[in-house]
Curated annotation (Swiss-Prot):
Signal peptide: none annotated. This is Chaperonin GroEL. Together with its co-chaperonin GroES, plays an essential role in assisting protein folding. The GroEL-GroES system forms a nano-cage that allows encapsulation of the non-native substrate proteins and provides a physical environment optimized to promote and accelerate protein folding. It comes from Serratia proteamaculans (strain 568). ATP binds at residues 30-33, 51, 87-91, 415, 479-481, 495. GO terms for cellular component: cytoplasm. The gene is groEL. Keywords: ATP-binding, Chaperone, Cytoplasm, Isomerase, Nucleotide-binding. InterPro entries: Chaperonin_Cpn60_CS, Cpn60/GroEL, Cpn60/GroEL/TCP-1, GroEL-like_apical_dom_sf, GROEL-like_equatorial_sf, TCP-1-like_intermed_sf. Its main location: cytoplasm. Belongs to the chaperonin (HSP60) family. It comes from the Bacteria. It is found in: Cytoplasm.
Length: 548
């Protein structure tokens, strides 16, 4: 086992604080509408330019191992805030730095670290309750656009785009962000259910100009099995032909004789058919077939539950207003499923989301909810260069997370005002002893730091602005973009309550751990390889000159 370097007490805390300050100072220059950019060097390709706090934090690794431990713990604050609310990473870092700096001063002055931590925790719990009281619901498009604009670093087009996407697919819909091909941002909305499976044969195509298949008011046969024998399908094909409607077959696979017969019948105009593979694999495929069945009012024909293809009737088939299939995707528009059944299915999947342990499973389940309940919107980000594209895409993703958080828990006045109002309500809060009271003061003072940093980044005097804002009431604050005072919510400067709450909670959590640190242990750096000097016994080699 390698030898360790151990530091105690003040020595450890000073080193740790130095690391905290390096990371926090790099991150906090990005805060607010007039925050600066940070350029990140990459081992290959062009450097990345960003104003995203968590992107900056992730890049920082310090040479001194004790300082690095401090930096990594604050990096954890930014990452946790990002995971929980998708934004607020810079705010969380600024809060953490302030609590740690003030807290360690108190420890150096002889306060009990555990009581300080208890005081900080007490203040944060009370502040979170105050934030909830200050919160107002965020339901209309205008408020959603404002939240998106603030989170995308005051880019109005992004805010409007997100609001439009949410309006079209609903709050349950899936909104994804992709790199576009042009200079302009675009919004593509897919209404209905779309899945990534295209036609099994190009001979089914009935719209050659677009290379797609369009079926109006079709029947939909859902089979959880491979279909290779046409005989078992004859009864249902005859019934569909009599009804004079097209048929879409969604099965594990359609192959061989069955596929050939369907193609021939389609080309002769006897019955209009198209076939696609069912989406997903294994259990996920079964679940998605059941989703499609619920959406279209059909039944999944599965031998596991005793249903056979030969005995399938028109009552077992689903229906929809229209279906569009191309070589990669199938879209079912306006399925004729019953609304209570669809809502029941959505509730069932939501329950699974609550219980899901992996992010991947959760994401797939959320996609299924969106396909049943709303739709899918794709924001295609446009930019002139790849460097700008990456930076803009990261901003749009942040803004999207922030707007979701706003819809979930409401909004509070932005620009650091909500934290100042929450802190002012807690001036009478007391702990059980003097050390806890100091902890409470540390937390309340830290809650001013985001506003102070925003003001500092726009070149004004933080103390003057902070005192003016504290003298005001309600949503009265400082708009750093226009350098004016006024009602923050009326000016459209909003922060999602969830973002502000998460930033404060995670900052206090990690800061509390660091204040109560008394010892730090790290590996000693490995020494250089020992110097072997002149290798013994080789001296006689000198006489080999005559070999030439």
């Amino acid at each position: 086992m390698a030898a360790k370097d151990v530091k105690f007490g003040n020595d450890a805390r000073v080193k740790m604080l130095r690391g905290v300050n390096v990371l926090a100072d790099a991150v906090k220059v990005t805060l607010g509408p007039k925050g600066r950019n940070v350029v990140l060097d990459k081992s290959f390709g062009a450097p990345t330019i960003t104003k995203d706090g968590v992107s900056v934090a992730r890049e920082i690794e310090l040479e001194d191992k004790f300082e690095n431990m401090g930096a990594q713990m604050v990096k954890e604050v930014a990452s946790k805030a990002n995971d929980a609310a998708g934004d607020g990473t810079t705010t969380a870092t600024v809060l953490a730095q302030s609590i740690i700096t003030e807290g360690l001063k108190a420890v150096a002055a002889g306060m009990n670290p555990m009581d300080l931590k208890r005081g900080i925790d007490k203040a944060v719990i009370a502040a979170v309750e105050e934030l909830k009281k200050l919160s107002v619901p965020c339901s209309d498009s205008k408020a959603i656009a404002q939240v998106g604009t603030i989170s995308a670093n005051s880019d109005e087009t992004v805010g409007k785009l997100i609001a439009e996407a949410m309006e079209k697919v609903g709050k349950e819909g899936v909104i994804t962000v992709e790199e576009g091909t042009g200079l302009q941002d675009e919004l593509d909305v897919v209404e209905g259910m779309q899945f990534d499976r295209g036609y099994l044969s190009p001979y089914f195509i009935n719209k050659p100009e677009t290379g797609s298949i369009e079926l109006e008011s079709p029947f939909i046969l859902l089979a959880d099995k491979k279909i290779s024998n046409i005989r078992e399908m004859l009864p249902v094909l005859e019934a569909v032909a009599k009804a004079g409607k097209p048929l879409l077959i969604i099965a594990e696979d359609v192959e061989g004789e069955a596929l050939a017969t369907l193609v021939v019948n389609t080309m002769r105009g006897i019955v209009k058919v198209a076939a696609v593979k069912a989406p997903g694999f294994g259990d996920r495929r079964k679940a998605m077939l059941q989703d499609i069945a619920t959406l279209t009012g059909g039944t999944v024909i599965s031998e596991e539950i005793g249903l056979e293809l030969e005995k399938t009737t028109l009552e077992d088939l689903g229906t929809a207003k229209r279906i569009v299939i191309n070589k990669d995707t199938t879209i079912i528009i306006d399925g004729n499923g019953e609304e209570p059944a669809i809502q029941g299915r959505v509730s069932q999947i939501r329950q699974q989301i609550e219980e899901a342990t992996s992010d991947y499973d959760r994401e797939k389940l959320q996609e299924r909810v969106a396909k049943l309940a709303g739709g899918v919107a794709v924001i295609k980000v446009g930019a002139a260069t790849e460097v700008e594209m990456k930076e803009k895409k990261a901003r749009v993703e942040d803004a999207l997370h922030a707007t979701r958080a706003a819809v979930e828990e409401g909004v509070v006045a932005g620009g650091g005002v909500a934290l100042i109002r929450a802190a002012s309500k807690l001036s009478e809060l007391r702990g059980v002893n003097e050390d806890q009271n100091v902890g409470i003061k540390v937390a309340l003072r830290a809650m001013e730091s985001p506003l102070r940093q925003i003001v500092l980044n726009c070149g004004e005097e933080p103390s003057v602005v902070a005192n003016t804002v504290k003298a005001g009431e309600g949503n009265y604050g400082y708009n750093a973009a226009t350098e004016e005072y006024g009602d923050m919510i009326a000016m459209g400067i909003l922060d999602p309550t969830k973002v502000t709450r998460s930033a404060l909670q995670y900052a206090a959590s990690v800061a509390g751990l660091m204040i109560t640190t008394e010892c730090m242990v790290t590996d000693l750096p490995k020494g250089d390889a020992p110097d072997l000097g002149g290798a013994g016994g080789m001296g006689g080699m000198g006489g080999m000159g005559g070999m030439m």
